[in-house]
């Protein structure tokens, strides 16, 4: 989820900011960003909307670059 962290920081948002926008706890968001919790498709869509992106632009690019 390095791409997510990079995008979040580039937009000057904190873990707390993201948690509030997503209506989840800060700890839950931290777990998502750090790969400790599985990311549902619905949550990926919600996160992508915050940055006006498609989920693939944030999450799929990491896997694509590893191939």
Regions found by a protein language model. Give the residues of each.
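Residues in the recognition helix of alpha-helical DNA-binding motifs
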Residues: 7, 21-22, 32, 61
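Short, charged recognition helix plus adjacent turn
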Residues: 7-12, 42, 49, 57-67
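Residues in the helix-turn-helix
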Residues: 17, 28, 57
């Amino acid at each position: 989820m390095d791409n997510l962290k990079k995008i979040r920081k580039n937009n000057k948002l904190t873990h707390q900011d993201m948690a509030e926008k997503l209506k989840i706890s800060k700890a839950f968001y931290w777990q998502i960003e750090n790969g400790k919790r599985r990311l549902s498709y619905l949550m990926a869509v919600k996160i992508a909307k915050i940055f006006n992106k498609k989920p693939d632009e944030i999450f799929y690019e990491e896997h694509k670059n590893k191939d």
